[in-house]
């Protein structure tokens, strides 16, 4: 199982040196990947039940940040977890991600999802209601653009006639993982995905996903059933889960062991919301996590 770190978007601050040091520390400590969250705009909370991020939460632009981290590191995988794809222009995302993959020497993993913030969609001029249908077509367009010098694609949301990227990415195609915990998402992953990023998904700013009977084990089994129905091998997709640094060493170990038993391939530690005041504290936190799990299951 591969261990990674969640980039502490909301707490790292704006010092480029601190951002570079965090990524380089993660690489030096032997972590496999850095997972970066995405939001373009934060919204003012809508009432006391709001559970999502707000305008007060800092988010570095994810693709620009990964370009910076590509130059600051040499080995560690760079992953979005997740990029809210339907609120972005597909061809532009294809170009940006291809460039990151080139600059990093083939180290990009693209995690995508539909998101929950309708305010963000409206501000970016995209349809919140159409996001589920759109993302499936976007996946097809991305893979066409990443693998062919010239593409002709005419769909519901895209029209490309004899056009393509130059240069193409190192990975052809770049791996596409998906976030989310609904049944629709699981079926989409089974048909189209390279991996599944679990944990912390919001159904809306007001209500988290209800507890699934059987927990993660039941969800993984459901995904495997959908993979079989789609004609794919049960272990055709990677499985990534997150664990909170604030949960403590005993919980880290228990989570890693449980996830390994379920066939999990990736586990990332999130250091946000643990009372860490400085970027250096986040580096110390991932060092402690790595020492607690020197040989992951």
What kind of region is each of these model predictions?
Residues 1-297:
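Active-site-adjacent structural elements that line small-molecule/cofactor binding pockets in enzymes
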């Amino acid at each position: 199982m591969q261990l990674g770190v969640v980039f502490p978007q909301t707490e790292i601050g704006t010092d480029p040196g601190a951002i570079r040091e965090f990524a380089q520390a993660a690489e030096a400590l032997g972590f496999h990947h850095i997972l970066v969250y995405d939001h373009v705009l934060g919204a003012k909370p809508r009432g006391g039940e709001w559970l999502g991020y707000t305008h007060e939460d800092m988010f570095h632009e994810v693709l620009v940040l990964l370009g910076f981290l590509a130059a600051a590191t040499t080995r560690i995988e760079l992953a979005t977890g997740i990029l809210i794809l339907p609120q972005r222009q597909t061809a532009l995302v294809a170009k940006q991600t291809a460039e990151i993959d080139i600059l990093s020497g083939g180290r990009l993993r693209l995690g995508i999802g539909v998101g929950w913030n309708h305010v963000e969609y409206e501000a970016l001029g995209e349809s919140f209601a159409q996001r589920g249908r759109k993302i499936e077509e976007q996946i097809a367009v991305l893979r066409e653009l990443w693998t062919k010098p010239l593409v002709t694609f005419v769909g519901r949301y895209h029209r490309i006639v004899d056009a393509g990227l130059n240069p193409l990415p190192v990975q052809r195609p770049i791996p596409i993982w998906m976030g989310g915990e609904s049944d629709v998402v699981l079926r989409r992953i089974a048909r189209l995905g390279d991996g599944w990023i679990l944990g912390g998904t919001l159904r809306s700013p007001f209500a988290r996903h209800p507890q699934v009977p059987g927990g993660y084990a039941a969800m993984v089994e459901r995904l495997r059933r959908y993979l079989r129905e789609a004609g794919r091998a049960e272990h055709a997709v990677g499985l990534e889960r997150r664990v909170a640094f604030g949960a403590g060493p005993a919980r880290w170990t228990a989570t890693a062991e449980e996830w390994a038993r379920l066939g999990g391939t990736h586990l990332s530690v999130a250091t946000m919301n643990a009372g860490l005041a400085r970027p250096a504290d986040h580096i110390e936190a991932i060092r402690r996590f790595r020492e607690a799990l020197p040989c992951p299951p």
